[in-house]
From Swiss-Prot:
This is CTP synthase. It comes from the Bacteria. Residues 1-270 are annotated as: Amidoligase domain. It comes from Ehrlichia canis (strain Jake). GO terms for biological process: 'de novo' CTP biosynthetic process; pyrimidine nucleobase biosynthetic process. Pfam families: CTP_synth_N (PF06418), GATase (PF00117). Allosterically activated by GTP, when glutamine is the substrate; GTP has no effect on the reaction when ammonia is the substrate. The allosteric effector GTP functions by stabilizing the protein conformation that binds the tetrahedral intermediate(s) formed during glutamine hydrolysis. Inhibited by the product CTP, via allosteric rather than competitive inhibition.
Amino acid sequence: MSNQTSSRFIFVTGGVVSSLGKGLAAASIGALLQARGFKICLRKLDPYLNIDPGTMSPIQHGEVFVTDDGAETDLDLGHYERFTGVKTTKNDNITTGKVYHNLLKKERRGDYLGQTVQIIPHVTDLINSFILHNTEGLDFVICEIGGTVGDIESQPFLESIRQIGYKLSKNNTIFVHLTLVPYIDAAMELKTKPTQHSVKELSAVGIQPDIILYRSKIPLSKEQRDKIANLCNVSPTNIIPALDVKNIYELPISYHNYNLDTQILKHFNVNSPDPNLSKWENILNISHTLTKTVTVAIIGKYIKLLDAYKSLIEALEHASIHNRVKLSIRWIDSRSLDSNGINAFDNVDSILIPGGFGDDGVKGKITAITHARLNKIPFLGICMGMQLAIVEFANNVAHLEDANSTEFNLYCKNPVIHQLPELQQNFLGGSMKLGSCPCYLDANSKIFSIYQQSVINERRRHRYTFNLQYKDLLEQHGLTFTGKANNTDDSLIEVIELNNHPWFIGVQFHPEFKSSPFHSHPLFISFIKASLSYQEAK
């Protein structure tokens, strides 16, 4: 492993339990260093054996975040992009599965020249290469290690960052460990023992944390902080609260107020001006003064785990702040919705159908689309949401018999949605149309008025598309196709709109992946504005 790098490395690990907010902590560190003028990048190392999360259930894993270059990645990369504005790539997320996939290809090629291939050094060398690659011009590289210290899957990654810490020395590496300090209601007391045990687990693999972030409802007392410092060999000034917040965009300011960025720079002996956090303060000031509320109904089948829609929720929040309104989301399980359950839409200001897979819950989504179309309620369909809007229109307006998607019925009479021919293969993983692609907009369309440009670039993740054989027929009945992948007549359809409706748009791409709190996505801004107009017109 070469130690020729001018970048400094920040490793973020987690202990006690998962879902403490390592990704948000890493993103906040990146935002704070960026606010001081440093160049940063963020990377995620996931210990699961899948090559990527593309085939994992959203109920288990949460959303799959798609990068511009078409990588299906962990949702934390979405936090990285939204907090820092730095675009992530396929080279910023690695899994155990990807490491072993590359390792075995190298072994089969004979790259190891007859060696016995082992976890150390061969697996750890590949992980080290991932961490250290493409760091030219970067002041800081922030690496989040997925999972929890003590998990068997995490051991090769922890060994790798231990090696890097040893090779590059304390002057170029820092270990930040996030733990849980639970509050026991019955005893009315914070408990530090889980943190002590977590640090002990980390020390057992040769890593001494330099900073401890503790997730808690309230800050520790000085006595409790000193106790952790003494037992964990960490300076009391480096034991920093990761307090619960109402809005995740409070985190950078909260961490700064507790000197997280100051202590990191002190560790590296780096001087810098104070961070400019005015844009974060502005977002919070706006969000704290909102009075009017719009209610968006989201109809999906993964609502048991809202992380399945993480980027979508954030994009709607960004657009709501931009429009100076509070956002209220009414989550509706598509599998429990039928034509008799339309009272679920009472007092909603708009309806949104997000992306998804499979026929489970499709009838409920169709019911929602019909309700939005007939009652002139603002409607946004994303990916499958657009496809189902076409299916609903073909059946109920164009009166095509048995119009459907071949995803749900391979032998339907009128397949208005069918599989992309070039994607018809046996493998499920990595077999979709992925990443950023251009989309050409009709100059006379609502979508053009929203974007104010004729060519846009958006990220895609789909296997099915509109069947162009039905284009003329559906246009005759009032459906317009206002965005396409290129300027040819046989181009893939990317955007649909409905005539005689105030705001009814379907998009094949995923606009939620390109929204941030400081650059709200124009499509969501327009959608929330239409929701507000609908509310005011009631």
